[in-house]
Structure formats: C-alpha cells, structure tokens
Amino acid sequence: MRNTSKEVQSTSYRYAPCDWYYHLPVKRSEKPVGAPPASQIPGLSDLRDSPSVNLPRARRYWIKETDSEYVKLAKQGGRPDLLKHFAPGTRQGSPVAYSLPDWYIHHSKPPTSLQREVPAVSIPEYMVYEEFNPDQANGSYESRQGPFDFDRKTIWQREAEELENVKRKVKLPAINSKNSSKAGTPVNNKDSDKSRLSLPPMPGPKTGSPTNFSKLISNGYKDEWLQQQKADSDRRTPKTSEASVSTQSTEDSKSKSSQDTETPQNSETPEGSEKTPDAEAPPSEATPEELK
C-alpha cells in the first residue's frame, strides 16, 4: 500500500516548481500605496506633520527642548527640498548645441583637406648614419655629445699633463713676522699686547740629533741629565766657599779694629789701677803656707 501511494505522488509531482530559480513579475495592485519619503533617509522627512500610524510612539518626543537649533533642523529633515530629486520637465523648443570656446579651436572654420599642411616625416637622428660636414651646417648648429665622450684626449696626452702638473712648484709668499717689522719703532704697551696675541712662529728645522731609542730605553738621557746637574752644582760650590771666606775676613778685620781701639784706653788708666794686681798677689802666695 505504501509503495502504491509513493508511486501516485511521484507521478502527480513529477516536475517540481522552479520558484527559487527565477522571480515572477508581481502584478500591479490598484490599491493606493504609501510613497516613501522624498529624502530616502528614514526619520528625516515629514517630521513636522503629525506622526502617522506606522511610526512608534517614541517618535512623538523625537525633538526635545534641550536640542540646539542645528539638531532640531537635522531631526526635522534639514532644509526643505535639500535631498529631493526633481525629474526634468518637458523641453520647450528644439535642442541647441553648445558653442565651441575660442581657446579650443584655432580657426573659426575648420580647415579643408586642401588647406591642411602635410606633416614632414623625418627619421630620428640616432637611426641615420651620416658624417657631419661643418661646411653644410648652419652657424646655430651645436654638435651633440654623449654623456661619456667629453674627454677626447689620448692616454699619452693625459699622462704628459699630469707630469707637468706635478713638476709645477707652488711659490708661497715670504712670511714676514711682526717683530721684525717693528724692530726700529719703540714698543708700546698696546703693541706688546698685540704681540702677545699674535700666533707663534712657524717651527724651523731641528738642529739637534734625532732621539736614540736604545739610549732612551737604557736611561742614557737620564744619566746625562744627572751628570749635567752635578756639574752645575760643582760650579756653584766654589762661589759659595769664596763668599764664606770673604765674610770671615771681614769679621777678622772688624775684630782687630775693635782690639786696637781698646788698647789706648788701657794705657790711660791711673797708677793705682796698675798696682791692684800686685796687692792681690800676696794672699795668693800665702795660701800655700797655710796649707803646709
């Protein structure tokens, strides 16, 4: 029974509809249909009018008192007829072509085929092999040079020029020092200050022998310096001894002069003063008798 029912269904619905493959044209309804807003943006047009039935109840309070003038104008749809598209109306009269501007064409009338100049056909210069003849060329002709053919000298000419440049000696002017120019004039304080600020003279050739590194490593220069210092000290010592001898001689001469001045004073002393040592002598002679 089940199989028979399936066979009947298969025969009745053998060809399935192809609604998914193509869209059938919808029949035009004669009922009035609400047109969409002119701006094609929902919520921006026809807000000044009373809200329709389709609008939600919240749209009644769409515009608030706290909104600025710009926001109120935007919520009401902006300026009137700002986003509306008007279809072009019917033309009155035949269409007229645009007039061509003066800067676009060279002549008021287009030139005919006879008036047109035939363009001169010329082959590029790099495709023509023709030797240059200066007699035939005009005075304004300038020979073209490639980017690498500026130097047209041979190797021998270039080497000769390099040797000549090496042989040439540059003569510098003589250096005149400021001190030599001012030798005859008296030196002032200002001149001395300027001379102090002047640059040092150029170093001349060294007269001394070059340094010997073996002698430098073995402290030979140190020994020479010590010997030189010792010789200088030996030269200074005799001068100091002579100075000490001269001071001693001056002191001896002063002492002798003081003794000479004291001797005449002793000669002028009275006779009583001369006998005093004799009076004092007897007690000295009596001392040994008492001791006996």
Curated annotation (Swiss-Prot):
UniProt-recorded name of the protein: Uncharacterized protein C7orf57 homolog
Composition bias type Basic and acidic residues, residue spans: 221-239
Keywords, alphabetical: Phosphoprotein
Positions of modified residues (Phosphoserine): S50
Keyword DNA repair: no
The keyword Phosphoprotein is assigned to this record: yes
Post-translational events: Phosphorylated upon DNA damage.
Chain positions covered by the region annotation Disordered: 29-50, 166-292
Biased composition (Polar residues): 176-189, 208-217, 240-250, 260-270
